[in-house]
């Protein structure tokens, strides 16, 4: 009997089972203990293979692939800290709903807790963050193949959102020629190998039913809050709110077109808050709101009813409103709750929004990050998509820009970390094959510098704009101690990214005015690969511009 051959037969069943649950993309890091999984994946023609040498970046690449494809994505890594490096991406997926399947190779039980190399306690290492955890036994022909495949089916069939951790111990030898070992064991599955269906099929029904009193509430004064959703859902929400005559407060990730622009500015005006207080019902579609003023208003509003609709389970409401938590996709919920044509009831807010937008446009001439955010619509590629980093840049775009309705926008706004942003953007581009504009800050770029290697395989033009304000300038907007701010919060690095781009063979530009940025982007959209554009801006102008606009709009 060949141990290495049976390891591969066992792994082949696992990988084939994944294909029955819609897995097409599989991300693989180098490793020896993961050899059975890697070779089984390589031999399975149903997969699109992605490789990366850095497991943390690999996890975020998978996250981006899952975001854009809206399908589960598998990841294969070896044992030890390689597995631990998947933690940030797993956490993000759990909060934003992408489906990740983590196949972590492991040492067999007799090599754990005895000083063996690269052997750590992997079962349960991700605590409560995976939706499900499976600790498989060492491959054995004493275990029926139908047990293995049904175990995988049970986990994936019940997966609504988030990650599944499947820990896979393998004993040595890991290498060797294939022989007949395990062929009869695999044949226990009969014609399953020729089918395209899971061995064990489950019906997952979690959606809320139609609200029977909707016909009553849709005649009231309402407000629509739009959080994270798909581009198609964003367009439908905008039309739905317009038909109802309800003001729509659209987050940057809502893709609604933000008909009431600059909400994070005008929500700082007392007149707007007073008018919103007249609302009898607030319907929030999608979670993960970005703007500070939006979150402050959302936390203090007290309508008669507060409904929160999202496909993810859980409360998703840090303000803990009294109302209804409705588990459904936004698209399905809109189908069940049609709008009734009514005249708009809010009259003050549209005018405040118009004036806030005019103020933002009037401030967009200097070359800076706030101005880039306000102008961002003109830089979007046709038939493309936008990936927005975290920290200051996403807040500036949320507050100052108006994005086209239905234009795809992606970001990691679950845990809102600055790790893995370049890798996530790379995954989003690969899954969609669309031209992609990605914008991150300098510290975010440094944090994920390894992932510039992933941009070399861009299948369409990809532009990474690095806004270099020399540190974490978001902390300039917080009441951080003045004396300690620069050393302990901002942490300026005084770097430029020309050498990083050159190291990975990427085109690079460093424009210093709007005309040179226009020229750099025009050239980048004409070339097939990736381009890094570094915008070196004044350290504090971005935060100061936002604060000045907030003060100006609050006085309108």
From Swiss-Prot:
Q: Which reaction is recorded as catalysed by this protein?
A: isochorismate + 2-oxoglutarate + H(+) = 5-enolpyruvoyl-6-hydroxy-2-succinyl-cyclohex-3-ene-1-carboxylate + CO2
Q: Which cofactor does it need?
A: Mg(2+); Mn(2+); thiamine diphosphate
Cofactor note from UniProt? Binds 1 thiamine pyrophosphate per subunit.
User: Pathway involvement?
Assistant: Quinol/quinone metabolism; 1,4-dihydroxy-2-naphthoate biosynthesis; 1,4-dihydroxy-2-naphthoate from chorismate: step 2/7; Quinol/quinone metabolism; menaquinone biosynthesis
Q: Which Enzyme Commission number(s) are listed? A: 2.2.1.9
- What are the alphabetically sorted keywords of the record? Magnesium, Manganese, Menaquinone biosynthesis, Metal-binding, Thiamine pyrophosphate, Transferase
From the Swiss-Prot or TrEMBL record, give the protein name: 2-succinyl-5-enolpyruvyl-6-hydroxy-3-cyclohexene-1-carboxylate synthase
Q: Which source organism?
A: Klebsiella pneumoniae (strain 342)
| Gene behind the chain | menD
């Amino acid at each position: 009997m060949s141990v290495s051959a049976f390891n591969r037969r066992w792994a082949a069943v696992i990988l084939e089972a994944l294909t029955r649950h819609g897995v097409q993309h599989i991300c693989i890091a180098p490793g020896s203990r993961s050899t059975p999984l890697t070779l089984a994946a390589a031999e399975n023609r149903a997969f699109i293979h992605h490789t990366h040498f850095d497991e943390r970046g690999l996890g975020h690449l998978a996250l981006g692939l899952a975001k854009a494809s809206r399908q589960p994505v598998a990841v294969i890594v070896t044992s030890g800290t390689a597995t631990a490096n998947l933690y940030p991406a797993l956490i993000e997926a759990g909060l934003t709903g992408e489906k990740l399947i983590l196949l972590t190779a492991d040492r067999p039980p007799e090599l754990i807790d005895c000083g063996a190399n690269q052997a750590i306690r992997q079962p349960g290492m991700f605590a409560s963050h995976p939706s499900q955890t499976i600790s498989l036994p060492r491959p054995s022909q004493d275990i029926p193949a139908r047990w293995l495949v049904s175990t995988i089916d049970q986990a994936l069939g019940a997966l609504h959102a988030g990650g599944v951790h499947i820990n896979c111990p393998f004993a040595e030898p890991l290498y060797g020629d294939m022989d007949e070992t395990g062929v009869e064991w695999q044949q226990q599955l009969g014609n399953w190998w020729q089918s395209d269906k899971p061995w064990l099929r489950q019906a997952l029904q979690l959606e809320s039913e139609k609200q029977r009193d909707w016909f009553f509430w849709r005649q009231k004064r309402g407000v629509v809050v739009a959080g994270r959703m798909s581009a198609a859902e964003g367009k439908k929400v905008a039309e739905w709110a317009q038909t109802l005559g309800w003001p729509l407060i659209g987050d940057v990730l809502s893709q609604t077109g933000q008909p009431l622009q600059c909400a994070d500015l005008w929500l700082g005006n007392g007149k707007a808050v007073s008018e919103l207080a007249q609302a009898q019902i607030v319907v929030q579609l999608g979670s993960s709101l970005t703007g500070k003023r939006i979150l402050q208003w959302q936390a203090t509003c007290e309508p008669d009813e507060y409904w929160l609709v999202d496909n993810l389970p859980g409360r998703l409401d840090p303000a803990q409103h009294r109302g209804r938590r409705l588990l459904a996709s936004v698209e399905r919920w809109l189908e069940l709750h049609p709008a009734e044509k009514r005249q708009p009831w809010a009259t003050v807010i549209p005018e405040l929004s118009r004036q806030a937008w005019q103020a933002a446009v009037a401030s967009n001439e200097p070359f800076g990050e706030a101005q880039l955010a306000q102008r961002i619509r003109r830089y979007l590629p046709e038939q493309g998509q936008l990936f927005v980093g975290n920290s200051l840049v996403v807040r500036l775009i949320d507050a100052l820009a108006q994005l086209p309705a239905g234009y795809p926008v992606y970001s990691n706004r679950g845990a809102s970390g600055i790790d893995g942003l370049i890798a996530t953007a790379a995954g989003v581009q690969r899954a969609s094959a669309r031209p992609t504009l990605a914008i991150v800050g300098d510290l975010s770029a440094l944090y994920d510098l390894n992932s510039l290697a992933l941009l070399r395989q861009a299948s369409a033009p990809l532009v990474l704009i690095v806004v270099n304000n020399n540190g974490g300038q978001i902390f300039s907007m917080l009441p951080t101690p003045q004396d300690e701010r620069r050393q302990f919060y901002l942490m300026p690095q005084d770097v430029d990214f020309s050498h990083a781009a050159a190291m990975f063979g990427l085109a690079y530009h460093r424009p210093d005015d709007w005309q040179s940025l226009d020229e750099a982007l025009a050239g980048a959209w004409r070339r097939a690969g990736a381009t890094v554009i570094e915008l070196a801006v004044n350290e504090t102008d971005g935060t100061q511009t936002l604060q000045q606009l907030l003060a100006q709009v609050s006085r309108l």
